[in-house]
């Protein structure tokens, strides 16, 4: 299996975390999105959307979109609950991550770290919705160790990378103790150093 990804991307980190935790062998192929490497003809042949992460399996099939890859790799493992309703709850968090968390928390980080904008340059809506997403996550974690069930799951993996890096987007986790404790639990459970 080959993982095409950018180490700086939280979406790519999800796939790496999952493969590492499940001890799935892979070759990492670095694609620097800031240098346009996901827009080359060679890469676009593999993924016409021009996005990472992308996994190419040994049989030549390719799969894009971080949460689809994570969920596929996790099938039959402890990362994906057996109970159909619990599986649906993991999907709920994973969809929420892509529509209500990542577009704000990750984009603020991207603009500050990679586009070298200042906090004052960020759109107020971006900051407000990112903070709201982190508040929603805090509420979802209050009184529980993980997002779904009593062990780490694909839902946690979907939300972990960009939440761990939220400070790079100007978001403060100091007032979100459940989230900070959850990050530490996930790092231990997933053997992230």
Describe the residue ranges of each PLM region.
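GST-like fold's C-terminal all-alpha helical module
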Residues: 82-85, 94-188
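Juxtamembrane membrane-interface segments at transmembrane alpha-helix termini
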Residues: 190-192
